[in-house]
UniProtKB/Swiss-Prot annotation:
Biased composition annotated in UniProt, kind: Pro residues: 926-935
Catalytic activity: L-seryl-[protein] + ATP = O-phospho-L-seryl-[protein] + ADP + H(+); L-threonyl-[protein] + ATP = O-phospho-L-threonyl-[protein] + ADP + H(+)
Function: Serine/threonine-protein kinase involved in different processes such as membrane blebbing and apoptotic bodies formation DNA damage response and MAPK14/p38 MAPK stress-activated MAPK cascade. Phosphorylates itself, MBP, activated MAPK8, MAP2K3, MAP2K6 and tubulins. Activates the MAPK14/p38 MAPK signaling pathway through the specific activation and phosphorylation of the upstream MAP2K3 and MAP2K6 kinases.
Gene name in the database record: Taok2
Organism: Rattus norvegicus
Domain Protein kinase: 28-281
Subunit structure: Self-associates. Interacts with MAP2K3 and MAP2K6. Interacts with tubulins. Interacts with MAP3K7 and interferes with MAP3K7-binding to CHUK and thus prevents NF-kappa-B activation. Isoform 2 interacts with PCDH8; this complex may also include CDH2.
Region (Disordered): 318-457, 892-941, 1210-1235
Compartments, as annotated in UniProt: Cytoplasmic vesicle membrane; Cytoplasm, Cytoskeleton
Classification via Pfam families: Pkinase (PF00069)
Coiled-coil boundaries: 488-523, 576-603, 683-715
Active-site annotation: 151 (proton acceptor)
Protein name, as recorded: Serine/threonine-protein kinase TAO2
Lineage: Eukaryota, Metazoa, Chordata, Craniata, Vertebrata
Compositionally biased intervals (Low complexity): 350-374
């Protein structure tokens, strides 16, 4: 076919004989799509002439590069026509219909890759040998005719019903060898194909390499380098060594065969004819290997289909539980055709299998030569999008031009553009769907502009007016031309204003897009950091789970060993008891036997036979008694053994349960710590995001203010120019009117009182216009008044448009200003005047020659209604506006966007003003259950007597401490529990204070006296000073003024000279008490901000050292502490497990600390048990005294039940997208389940 021919043309006889003239839709029926690829779709069909099952490959040659597609189709058809071999796919014919080629071929069951997909495991070596042998025979046939397949892989090796192996998919094949084109599938490509563009040609040995890769694919379910990118795989194939089989259980023949196929140098690689003589393919194997493999695959597919059908049937019955049962078989028959999978062997009937596939459409990667269609489609889409964007940009101007045309008619065809998705997949979903022939869309002729048409009409008028008589004067024509030029200037001015606004809007959009990109990058970085932390947490959790599992297995093995030892011990004891019993029975039997013999000897008259019988009966009785005794012993031993085993198992089960509880508690503590660390990270990320958004908001506001300033300056300049021009016109008009007045009227106007100014249509007249005024008569005063009234009536429309400073406008000017500018209206109810007299005083402007401040200028331009909206916006966003004004931002009106871009801004924006706040902003959520009611301990009114007693006791003890310092520890121990409780002392606080005091005293003594060798007297003095400072600080913090007063009174009585220092200390303490909270809050916030800017590792270390308090975090982020939604301080949980045996002093201190913690826990649990056993009246008394305190509910975030979470999710999904909540759900992040 000539290169310049049209695609689908059959004028060439050589091309026409390749295709049949019949209609394929009439020849083939029951078409079902069974595969898809970049080339098109593959269909299962049945020939109506002979009921033969065939495979139809539909390929479209329409669209871009149709000639190249047509040439590929012709090449493939010619290639298939030449094939005559049992191991190649058989060609049935090719038909053309509606720019689609129907390539009809022999139908096969499927490909070798389908076998891997169905069985989910590699093939056996015998099966690989059979498949390879058949493929080699087909390749040998191709190579003997100088043909190259160039796309050999498991997906292109097909299996037929009789068990034959066939080569398929010759779309990449080459009719001539050698070849030099870059064609094939990347992972199966030979090195010489990859390097063909640089190093030259290649021959049929490239198929041998691909066959070796296919063997590895059949043996390992995927080709080498399959987990790598396609381009990287090509580089590795060309540069690295040849791949090999990974597993070691394959035979040496198979390994040698694969190594021979994968020789890197083509000259060392054997041909297909040589490989047919290899021992791997010539070894003895059952002749029904392929048939057995196909049958086994059919059975597996049938089972999968039945399972899928049962699942679908179950789903259908669940959706329609009342459906009739008689329709089940019909539903089964209808559901089975839709359960086929492209690339798998499928069974439609239980007796025999109907194939599902003919051509390889299930390979995991497409060929390289098939990527051109997708790229062409993508380029076509990009070009169409660019054309649409250009049309959208030119749209408003062209519409304006069309509106300005007069006397001319244009016909425009608005044809819709059909978009095609990348690739031609969707073109073949319906075989009966006609396809449209795309043709180049002819753009309509550009309409002539209004300027050219008006200038042409003017030139025609000028040419014709010389040949025709006219009554129009030259001055009238010149004035009309001048007015038209003025209108054109105004129109051009408005066009420039529109272009400026559009440019400003684009600049704002570009800035917002850039800032949005920064936010997305920042969000992605924070998300990666969070995911990395979560991955670390997951690794730690897995390690902990493995350790717990190892501990559990170890304990189970130890328990089993102990149980066996225990059973063996009991069995040994019982065996000894049984042996002793048997020994005793033997002795008793001998003694009894001797006694019986003696008794027989004493009575000699008894016959011998009777003696023997009597002796036998006595022996039997004795043996029976011994047997019963032995059976009773065995029964007792068995009962004892069972009882002991049950008791031991119970004991071991309790121990295992306790171990499981400890492990579970450790796991929960670890998870709580991880959640707290994650919460801290999220808080830090929130702070960083807030700062970024603040900076971006400042940048946007600065840009918006600058653009608004430029816009206002332009508007002001245009308005001043217009006002100057109108003032000049009015002066000329007024001068002409004055010149036309009679002299008597001028004299009358000059005789007016000095205090009464001469008024006109526009208010006070200028002084320069009345230089020639003379008195006028009273009769002409009425005429002047009527003229002035008429001028005022003419000025009314202009006042509604421009204010009181202008005069009347022509109707054409009103139309231009009202329609094109879009900011004025002739209705006084809709808009106020744009320019007011007192704000836009031209004389004052000319005298002062300065521009008013921008804020007042904006408010004057906006008008009263816009100023009211401004005030409303200020009320709604008062805090933000105040902060912006403090930062120096100039607030301006939001630029009116271009009409084409309004919808995009509304979609990109957040929730509108007035949207209700959700739990993510700190508000309570309806999904969270209410807190449990307070316990009965808080319901009793607390008695005031213990409070007075405690304060009096502290005051008296403080007075005593002033005289005797030995009572200072007692005062500190009493003060600590009183400070720990809100309404008085508590038992738990007292125990804690005692423990803290003793441990602190002991640790300080060991450190100072033992390590630093401090003298005991100095240590005692230091301990007293520390205790005194602690007493004063604690009493000052809780407001217990009795303690310092008692100490001061005692010291004054002992040392009167301390009065002045004590007074100074009291004054300083009062000032510190007043200013202390504010200073502490400021220092705390500064400290927290410094910590939040540190790296996560340092921040985590400081958390472990308790350098970050939850009170400070919640003060810095108050939304996280609303309505009880707060988390605990993220401090890492102490490391569990046995401590290392070392003799370091710190290790000894750690052991002592662990021992103290253990005793503290035991003491607290004993106190809790004791309190639970007390009667209610005793609990009430102890609670009123402050010795007991009710347990507070945990403020750790609670996880909602799964049902409530699903209800919340379903409710949020059922909301329509147009509602406020729906819009907010589209823009806001989903709430965590515990919120």
């Amino acid at each position: 076919m000539p290169a310049g021919g049209r695609a689908g043309s059959l004028k060439d006889p050589d091309v026409a004989e390749l295709f049949f003239k019949d209609d394929p839709e009439k020849l083939f029926s029951d078409l079902r799509e069974i595969g898809h690829g970049s080339f098109g779709a593959v269909y299962f069909a049945r020939d109506v002439r002979n009921s033969e099952v065939v495979a139809i490959k539909k390929m479209s040659y329409s669209g871009k590069q149709s000639n190249e597609k047509w040439q590929d189709i012709i090449k493939e058809v010619r290639f298939l026509q030449k094939l005559r071999h049992p191991n190649t796919i058989q060609y049935r014919g090719c038909y053309l219909r509606e720019h689609t080629a129907w390539l009809v071929m022999e139908y096969c069951l499927g490909s070798a890759s389908d076998l891997l997909e169905v069985h989910k495991k590699p093939l056996q070596e015998v099966e690989i040998a059979a498949v390879t042998h058949g493929a080699l025979q087909g390749l040998a046939y191709l190579h003997s005719h100088n043909m190259i397949h160039r796309d050999v892989k498991a997906g292109n090796i097909l299996l037929s019903e009789p068990g034959l192996v066939k080569l398929g998919d010759f779309g990449s094949a080459s009719i001539m060898a050698p070849a030099n084109s870059f064609v094939g599938t990347p992972y199966w490509m030979a090195p010489e194909v990859i390097l063909a563009m640089d190093e030259g040609q290649y021959d049929g040995k490239v198929d041998v390499w691909s066959l070796g890769i296919t063997c590895i694919e059949l043996a390992e379910r995927k080709p080498p380098l399959f987990n790598m990118n396609a381009m990287s795989a090509l580089y590795h194939i060309a540069q690295n060594e040849s791949p090999a089989l990974q597993s070691g259980h394959w035979s040496e023949y198979f390994r040698n065969f694969v190594d021979s196929c994968l020789q890197k140098i083509p000259q060392d690689r054997p041909t297909s004819e040589v490989l047919l003589k290899h021992r791997f393919v010539l070894r003895e194997r059952p002749p029904t290997v392929i048939m057995d493999l196909i049958q086994r695959t059919k059975d597996a597919v049938r089972e999968l289909d039945n399972l899928q059908y049962r699942k679908m049937k179950k789903i259908l019955f669940q959706e329609a539980p009342n459906g009739p049962g008689a329709e089940a078989p019909e539903e089964e028959e209808e559901a089975e055709p839709y359960m086929h999978r492209a690339g798998t062997l499928t069974s439609l009937e239980s007796s025999h299998s109907v194939p599902s596939m003919s051509i390889s459409a299930s390979s995991q990667s497409s060929s390289v030569n098939s990527l051109a269609d997708a790229s062409d489609n993508e380029e076509e889409e990009e070009e169409e999008e660019e054309e649409e964007e250009e049309e959208e940009e030119e749209g408003p101007e062209s519409r304006e031009m069309a509106m300005m045309q007069e006397g001319e008619h244009t016909v425009t065809s608005h044809s819709s553009i059909i978009h095609r998705l990348p690739g031609s997949d969707n073109l073949y979903d319906d075989p009966y769907q006609p396809e449209m022939t795309p043709g180049p869309l002819q753009p309509p002729a550009a309409p002539p502009t209004s300027t050219s048409s008006s200038s042409a009409r003017r030139r025609a008028y000028c040419r014709n007016r010389d040949h025709f008589a006219t009554i129009r004067t030259a001055s009238l024509v010149s004035r009309q031309i001048q007015e038209h030029e003025q209108d054109s200037a105004l129109r051009e001015q408005l066009s420039g204003y529109k272009r400026m606004r559009r440019q400003h809007q684009k600049q704002l959009l570009a800035l917002e897009s850039r800032l949005r990109g920064e936010r997305e990058e920042h969000s992605g970085r924070l998300q990666r950091e969070l995911e990395a932390q979560r991955a670390g947490f997951g690794t730690e959790a897995e390690k902990l789970a493995r350790r717990h599992q190892a501990i559990g297995e170890k304990e189970a093995r130890a328990a089993q060993a102990e149980e066996r030892k225990f059973q063996q011990h009991i069995l040994g004891q019982q065996k000894k008891e049984l042996a002793a019993l048997l020994e005793a029975q033997k002795r008793t039997y001998k003694l009894r036997k001797e006694q019986l013999k003696e008794e027989l000897q004493e009575n000699p008259s008894t016959p011998k036979r009777e003696k023997a019988e009597w002796l036998l009966r006595q022996k039997e009785q004795l043996q029976q008694c011994q047997a019963e005794e032995e059976a009773g012993l065995l029964r007792r031993q068995r009962q004892y053994f069972e009882l002991q085993c049950r008791q031991y198992k119970r004991k071991m089960l309790l121990a295992r349960h306790s171990l499981d509880q400890d492990l579970l508690r450790e796991d929960l503590n670890k998870k709580q710590t991880q959640k707290d660390l994650e919460c801290a990270l999220l808080l830090r990320q929130h702070e960083a995001t807030r700062e970024l958004e603040l900076r971006q908001l400042q940048a946007v506001q600065r840009t918006r203010a600058e653009l608004t300033r430029l816009q206002h300056q332009t508007e002001l300049g245009n308005q001043l120019e217009y006002n100057k021009r109108r003032e000049q016109e009015l002066r000329q008009k007024h001068a002409a009117q004055v010149r036309q007045q009679p002299k008597s009227l001028k004299v009358r106007a000059g005789q007016l009182p000095m205090g009464l100014p001469a008024t006109g249509a526009l208010g006070p007249l200028s002084t320069g216009t009345l230089s020639e005024e003379q008195p006028c008569s009273s009769g002409q005063e009425a005429i002047l008044g009527q003229r002035m009234l008429g001028e005022e009536e003419e000025a009314v429309p202009e006042r509604m448009i421009l204010g009181k400073e202008g005069t009347t406008l022509e109707p054409e000017e009103q139309r231009i200003l009202g329609e094109e500018m879009g900011t004025f209206s002739s209705s006084p109810q809709k808009h106020r005047s744009l320019v007011n007299e007192e704000d836009w005083d031209i004389s004052k402007e000319m005298k002062e020659s300065r521009v008013p401040s921008l804020a007042s200028q904006e408010r004057n331009i906006i008008g009263q209604e816009e100023a009211g909206a401004w005030n409303l916006w200020e009320k709604e966003h008062g805090n933000l506006v105040d902060m912006e004004f403090k930062l120096g931002w100039v607030q301006g009106p939001v630029l009116t966007p271009v009409p084409e871009e309004e919808e995009e801004e509304e979609e990109e924006g957040g929730a509108p003003i007035g949207t209700p706040r959700d739990p993510g902003d700190g508000c309570p959520s309806p999904d969270i259950p209410p807190e449990p009611p307070p316990s009965h301990l808080r319901q009793y009114p607390a008695s005031q007597l213990p409070g007075f007693l405690s304060h009096g006791l502290l005051t008296g003890l403080s007075f005593a401490v002033g005289s005797s310092s030995g009572l200072l520890p007692l005062l500190l121990l009493l003060l600590l529990p009183l400070l720990a409780a809100q309404g008085g002392g508590g038992l738990q606080a007292a125990l804690l204070a005692l423990e803290v005091g003793l441990v602190g005293l002991g640790a300080s003594y060991l450190f100072l006296c033992t390590a630093l060798h401090l003298p005991p007297s100095l240590f005692l003095l230091l301990a007293q000073g520390t205790a005194l400072g602690a007493v004063l600080s604690l009493s000052w913090r809780r407001g217990l003024m009795g303690v310092p007063l008692g100490l001061g009174a005692a010291w004054l009585l002992a040392w009167p000279s301390l009065a002045l220092p004590l007074a100074a200390m009291a004054a300083g303490g009062k000032w510190v008490r007043q200013q202390g909270p504010q200073m502490r809050r400021g220092i705390s916030r500064l400290w927290l901000r410094v910590l939040l800017r540190l790296s996560p590792m340092v921040f985590r270390a400081l958390q472990g050292c308790a350098a970050v308090g939850d009170r400070g975090l919640f003060a810095l982020y108050p939304k996280t502490n609303k309505n009880g939604f707060r988390s605990r301080l993220p401090v890492p949980w102490p490391r569990q497990g046995n401590p290392r045996t070392t003799q370091h002093p710190l290790a000894l201190l750690a052991r002592v600390w662990a021992l103290c913690k253990g005793w503290n826990w035991r003491l607290a649990r004993a106190s809790h048990r004791l309190a639970s056993c007390l009667p209610p009246w005793a609990v009430h008394i102890l609670a009123s005294w402050g010795l007991l305190k009710g347990e507070r509910p945990s403020r750790i975030p609670r996880l909602l039940p799964r049902s409530q979470r699903r209800l919340g999710l379903s409710a949020s999904r059922q909301l329509p997208p147009g509602t406020v909540a729906g819009r907010r759900s589209q823009t806001r992040r989903a709430l965590p389940p515990w919120r």
